[in-house]
């Protein structure tokens, strides 16, 4: 290889080294956290055996959900192959928590495109939230990120649920860091402590060394 190219390669690797090191540290931290949960809950080959669940329960699924709770500091979890997509999981949560007359607020601009029909923003899908009498508010972004003042203004005594989407999805806004999510949750709870803070944490699992949203959010979808 040309000596000049070799030098460029060395300089590029040296420049990237701190980032690679940080990624390795995050990976090691989270791998250790998962393995610790495996040991704590005595995961074994027995739990990977197939089961029809008929009359006997499903120990593998139950063990997986125990481990998931431990890793994310949750009270309970649903980790099931019956959820065919993230939209399916999100819709399940929203349809379970929201009743006619309740108000839902999307705190970080518009949600995923696929959620628009679930909420009833577009189309006329049977059973969408708006058709069931759920009120919907959307807090516009401030430039390329969230607006805490606007979020506070959107929350009142009638706000049942605030959805916080961590990933930018198909938009060009910034994705949220755990610190950002905590600020939004604190803002919502200061305005109405009874409001449910629901975090869509899709693509955000195991990407840092913080316990983050699970310590502050009421519900979280991963």
Question: Which sequence ranges carry the predicted segments?
Answer:
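A generic alpha-helix surface/boundary motif
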Residues: 62-63, 88
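A broadly tuned, weak detector of single residues within folded domains
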Residues: 61, 97, 217-218
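Long amphipathic N-terminal alpha/beta scaffold segment
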Residues: 63-74
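Conserved PLP-enzyme active-site core in the AAT-like
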Residues: 4-9, 16, 24, 34-35, ...
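Active-site rim recognition segments
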Residues: 31
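N-terminal small-domain helix-loop-helix segment of the aminotransferase-like
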Residues: 52-60
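Single conserved hydrophobic/aromatic residue that forms the stacking wall/gate
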Residues: 212-222
């Amino acid at each position: 290889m040309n000596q000049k190219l070799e030098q460029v390669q060395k300089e590029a690797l040296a420049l990237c080294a701190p980032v690679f090191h940080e990624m390795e540290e995050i990976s090691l931290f989270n791998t250790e956290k998962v393995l610790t949960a495996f040991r704590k809950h005595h995961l074994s080959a027995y739990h990977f055996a197939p089961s029809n669940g008929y009359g006997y329960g499903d120990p593998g699924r139950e063990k997986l959900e125990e481990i998931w709770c431990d890793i994310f500091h949750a009270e309970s979890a649903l980790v099931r192959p019956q959820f065919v997509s993230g939209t399916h999981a999100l819709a399940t949560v929203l349809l379970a928590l929201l009743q006619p007359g309740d108000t839902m607020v999307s705190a970080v601009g518009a949600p995923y495109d696929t959620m628009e029909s679930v909420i009833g923003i577009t189309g006329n899908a049977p059973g969408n939230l708006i058709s069931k009498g759920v009120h919907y508010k959307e807090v516009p972004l401030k430039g390329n990120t969230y607006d805490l003042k606007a979020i506070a203004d959107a929350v009142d005594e009638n706000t049942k649920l605030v959805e916080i989407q961590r990933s930018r999805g198909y938009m060009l806004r910034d994705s949220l860091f755990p610190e950002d999510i905590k600020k939004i949750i604190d803002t919502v709870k200061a305005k109405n402590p009874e409001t449910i803070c629901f975090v869509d944490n899709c693509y955000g699992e195991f990407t840092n060394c913080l316990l983050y949203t699970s310590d502050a959010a009421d519900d979280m979808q991963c």
